[in-house]
Amino acid sequence: MVKRESSTVAASTAATVAKAPAMPPPPPEPSALAIALAHLPFANGERLEYQVKYGFLGVGNATLEVLGLDSVRGAPAVHASFVVKGGIRIYRVNDSYESWFDPRSFSTLRAIQNIDEGKYDRQRDFEFFPNRTMLSENGKPETPTVADPLDEASFLFFLRSIPLEVGKTYEFARYFRPEKNPVRVIVERKDTIKVPAGKFNTIVVRPVIKTSGIFGEGGHAEIWFTDDSTRTLVQLKSSLKFGSLNLYLRNRRAGTAWDTAAASVAPAR
């Protein structure tokens, strides 16, 4: 009788255990790509629109835009652009910089530049191979570049991702032309400014690149980023050969969540 009762209890216990609901599987670990995208201060589809002034004259428009998540040679790439159009009769600027950069390393993988500043006019297409520190320009044989290269457009987005401490000068050997390095970024001060888009607390930086153009060493450029986690570029002033070319934020369209399915997660080649 005791053995029969023990068997009955054991069977009942086994049945209870068998009927217990299964524990759900743990959520998958986020990928390196998802983690990198989550830490970016800008989002998919962000569009910043600017009024361009040459001195005191309103003479054009500019945009800084995140066009989406793409793929370059199997590697994920943020596609972004910086476009400036404006000027006066004796000096006009019509610049377009497109960049595809890996959000995990902030390395440029591809860049297209159409630069028209005064009498300077050039179109260049670049393919970057960060793992080999090489680049190809306009389909020509490869030449050396730097580790984790950055072009002009990706450098603007890179500046939004780093700490900016007033009084410090940061140096980076990441401009894609090795002989033009280091790029110096001088954090000058904090400032409260008013632009068409509103009033902002900002951090003012001065980038210096050993090249011609808006950020060239021969001129003087300052950038006002918002003093918050987004580091939105709200104002840019650049002294050029024929005067000052200034950008003032007039409209901001916030971005949306990234869709990691839009790009491969292969390493950059």
Each model region followed by its residue ranges:
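Acidic, serine/threonine-rich low-complexity disordered tracts
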Residues: 1-130, 163-269
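Hydrophobic, well-structured mid-protein blocks that either form specific transmembrane helices
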Residues: 120-162
